[in-house]
Amino acid sequence: MLYRIARAGIFKLDAEKAHDLAIQNFKRFNGTPLDIFYRQNLASKPVEVMGIKFKNPVGLAAGLDKNGECIEAFGAMGFGFVEVGTVTPRPQSGNDKPRLFRLIEAEGIINRMGFNNLGVDNLVENVKKAKYDGVIGINIGKNKDTPIEKGTEDYLICMEKVYQYAGYIAVNISSPNTPGLRTLQYGEALDDLLSQLKEKQKELAEKYGKYVPVALKIAPDLEDDELTQIAESLIKYKIDGVIATNTTLDRSMVEGMKHAEEMGGLSGRPVQTRSTEVVRRLKELLGDNLPIIGVGGIDSYVAAKEKMVAGAELVQVYSGFIYKGPGLVRDIVNNI
């Protein structure tokens, strides 16, 4: 109820200004009496996935805390894990504004942010300072001005810098807002990326005496033969997990709505069904070879359960959290 009242005011603001204000307030309130407005003491629902123990299976998806500024605040809300980023080797401002739009009647969001972030070094410092007893995933990407044929180098740079501070590393090759990025999901480009990531992972595991799992984040806009090829590559290169899915370019669910024609990736309830279909198909293809983290339109316990029945072992929320607030985390954790 409290969040519903607050949301009415928040939604009067431009979407990106509201996001920035929320991040500022989470930083300001954390550890003060004011964090009572979002702090939740939830029951432990431990699960082990990718060799990591999570205190519950509900995580924050990447994109909300790009620079790792509010890890403790999100932990206070009850998330079992927090995925920060996407982060790139060098700071970049992202695409031109406006670049974030609410589709309120569909409970969706369109973004064309373009990996705006303060760079991997800044994020690492924030992660090192965070006092959070959950799992921190770090989502990595490539800089916009890095040619796609050299994109693997950016992922390896980020991987080396975040490795010893990450609970797991998420490799984002599925954002529609960086030109050419999604081509890394296919054929030889994918195989080359995965083989080099595994080599680097082995090297870093020996260097630090610590094995950090790597998960690949994929798009929902894939044909069945493309999903099949991705699954085969994930198994071939012994990737530790897959995150399904990122945002969609499909607008069939929101035709005629305000902002529906804006360029960018659509998230929230409109992508719920398709992302669940991808999770289900991946489970058929992967079997027990590697776990699936389900994300896309999770806005209730029922939606989270659908992802898990389809084959996900962990779930993540983002758009649903924007529309429902911290109570969504409580609802899922208490009923899962």
Swiss-Prot record:
It is a peripheral membrane protein. FMN binds at residues 62-66, 86, 139, 172, 217, 245, 268, 297, 318-319. Binds 1 FMN per subunit. Pathway: Pyrimidine metabolism; UMP biosynthesis via de novo pathway; orotate from (S)-dihydroorotate (quinone route): step 1/1. GO terms for cellular component: cytoplasm; plasma membrane. It is an enzyme of class 1 (oxidoreductase). The active site is at 175 (nucleophile). Its EC number is 1.3.5.2. Keywords: Cell membrane, Flavoprotein, FMN, Membrane, Oxidoreductase, Pyrimidine biosynthesis. It is found in: Cell membrane. It catalyses: (S)-dihydroorotate + a quinone = orotate + a quinol. Its cofactor is FMN. Catalyzes the conversion of dihydroorotate to orotate with quinone as electron acceptor. Belongs to the dihydroorotate dehydrogenase family. Type 2 subfamily. This is Dihydroorotate dehydrogenase (quinone). The gene is pyrD.
